[in-house]
């Protein structure tokens, strides 16, 4: 039989105190909704229906055509939300997973096990449960003397005995699809919240003598529902440890997982070393044998093998094998560093292509430039690429020596094997094999210094 999934993503998330819908808040680089969607793929659903409401278009844009969508205009409870999927699913035969879009830590493995348990036990409904050290706020799983599930009681409706129960409802279920939509016709709002509880269908099934079961998670963390910024930070911490552990299993050294911030889609090759306080975001990819030292921050960067990045920032750039960057360098979007390039301390490179074995050791700005191989930038070199309105390009050939404190005013071309004298302001193109000198001639005025206040004769 087919599997289906309903993802509940209509809520505003008032306690988040945010303009964003709750499920749009990110954990380790992607939205909570995307985490849930990825995990749901493990059950190989024939159809996924996402229930949307608050700022629906934002939520719809995240999943695009990978899901069907239904609107819940009024948020009248979880049961009401599932009712919205009736037109999409009610006549289908199979098993339907119902899961909240704010549970980013649930794993695909657990959902697959839940479906398997449901099918093997021939249940009409199976509840995903967990044991909570502090169950306050959760619905409680009430069992009879034969350990069978009899009902789920919400916190506000629980009596003193029921509030002592540690087994909680995670808010994730599997149902026989047609039985689910039949039972939803019989639920009402006679409860403390005045809402349609999805949990009420469990009681309906029990009264009808249908089989209801519960599959208990081994790891309570997976059950975490994010309702506020505190829980969001908790989810982030758990996910970070999970991600770091997987990289370590794959052969990466993560010196201190507590301080490594690695987004879920980041790729890292074997034998690479991630020192403390490193942040790797977005679609960053790191090759083999690369060292990222304390404080490095990479966003959507493509980094090759045997690279060393020392306490530097790299954004949306390509760094080839054997490159060294930093300390305190900034590689800005649109930059490409070829093999063997060295970008040293306090160097900024923006929107530039730098050829093999070129070196900019210190205190340099290279912007909107195309640079050949084996070029040396002296300290203090500046490409002047902006006139206040437009950006201009600097083109530098191969085997060029740029003297210290050179100012290169674009648009400008410097030919192969050329040299600029230290302290020069270069405004015109420099031909191949030429030396360009663009500075005032030094004049020494002998004896003038003894008239100045600093001179010993004046003290």
Curated annotation (Swiss-Prot):
Spans annotated as Linker: 230-250
Stored InterPro entries: Bifunctional_GlmU, GlmU-like, GlmU_C_LbH, Hexapep, NTP_transferase_dom, Nucleotide-diphossugar_trans, Trimer_LpxA-like_sf
Active site (UniProt): 362 (proton acceptor)
Residues annotated as binding UDP-N-acetyl-alpha-D-glucosamine: 8-11, 22, 72, 77-78, 139, 154, 169, 227, 332, 350, 365, 376
Region listing for Pyrophosphorylase, in residue ranges: 1-229
Catalytic function, reaction form: alpha-D-glucosamine 1-phosphate + acetyl-CoA = N-acetyl-alpha-D-glucosamine 1-phosphate + CoA + H(+); N-acetyl-alpha-D-glucosamine 1-phosphate + UTP + H(+) = UDP-N-acetyl-alpha-D-glucosamine + diphosphate
GO process annotations (BP): cell morphogenesis; cell wall organization; lipid A biosynthetic process; peptidoglycan biosynthetic process; regulation of cell shape; UDP-N-acetylglucosamine biosynthetic process
Residues noted as binding Mg(2+) in the record, renumbered to the chain: 102, 227
Cofactors: Mg(2+)
Enzyme class: transferase
Keywords: Acyltransferase, Cell shape, Cell wall biogenesis/degradation, Cytoplasm, Magnesium, Metal-binding, Multifunctional enzyme, Nucleotidyltransferase, Peptidoglycan synthesis, Repeat, Transferase
Name of the protein described by the UniProt record: Bifunctional protein GlmU
Lineage: Bacteria, Bacillati, Bacillota, Bacilli, Lactobacillales
């Amino acid at each position: 039989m087919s599997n289906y999934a309903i993802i509940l993503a209509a809520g505003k998330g008032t306690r988040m105190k945010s303009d964003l819908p709750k499920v749009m808040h990110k954990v380790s680089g992607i939205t909570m909704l995307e985490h849930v969607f990825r995990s749901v793929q493990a059950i190989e659903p024939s159809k996924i229906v996402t229930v949307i409401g608050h700022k629906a278009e934002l939520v719809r844009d995240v999943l695009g055509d990978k899901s069907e969508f239904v609107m819940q205009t009024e948020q009248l409870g979880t049961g009401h939300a599932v009712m919205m999927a009736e037109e999409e699913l009610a006549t289908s035969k199979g098993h339907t997973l119902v899961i909240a879009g704010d549970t980013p830590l649930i794993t695909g493995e657990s959902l697959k096990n839940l479906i398997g348990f449901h099918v093997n036990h021939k249940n009409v409904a199976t509840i995903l449960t967990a044991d909570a050290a502090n169950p306050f706020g959760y619905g409680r799983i009430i069992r009879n003397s034969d350990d069978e599930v009899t009902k789920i009681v919400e916190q506000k409706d629980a009596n003193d005995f029921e509030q002592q129960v540690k087994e909680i409802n995670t808010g994730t279920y599997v149902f026989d699809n047609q039985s689910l939509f039949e039972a939803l016709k019989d639920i009402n709002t006679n409860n403390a919240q005045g809402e349609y509880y999805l949990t009420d269908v469990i009681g309906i099934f029990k009264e009808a003598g249908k089989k209801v079961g519960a599959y208990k998670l081994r790891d309570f963390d997976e059950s975490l529902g994010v309702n506020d910024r505190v829980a969001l930070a908790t989810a982030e911490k758990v996910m970070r440890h999970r991600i770091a552990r997987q990289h370590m299993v794959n052969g990466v050294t993560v010196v201190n997982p507590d301080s490594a911030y690695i987004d879920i889609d980041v790729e890292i090759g074997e034998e690479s070393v991630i020192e403390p306080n490193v942040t790797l975001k977005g679609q960053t990819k790191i090759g083999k044998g690369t060292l990222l030292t304390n404080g490095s921050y990479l966003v959507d960067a493509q980094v090759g093998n045997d690279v060393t990045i020392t306490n530097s920032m790299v954004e949306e750039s390509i760094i080839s094998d054997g490159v060294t960057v930093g300390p305190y360098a900034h590689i800005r979007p649109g930059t490409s560093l070829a093999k063997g390039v060295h970008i040293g301390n306090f160097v900024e490179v923006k929107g530039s292509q730098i050829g093999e074995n070129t070196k900019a050791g210190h205190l340099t700005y290279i912007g909107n430039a195309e640079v050949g191989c084996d070029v040396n930038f002296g300290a203090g070199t500046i490409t002047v690429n902006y006139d206040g309105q437009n950006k201009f390009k600097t083109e530098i050939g191969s085997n060029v020596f740029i003297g210290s404190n050179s100012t290169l005013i674009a648009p400008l071309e410097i030919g192969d094997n050329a040299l600029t004298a230290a302290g020069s302001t270069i405004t015109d193109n420099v031909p191949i094999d030429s030396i360009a000198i663009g500075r005032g001639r030094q004049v020494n005025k002998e004896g003038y210094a003894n008239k100045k206040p600093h001179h010993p004769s004046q003290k």
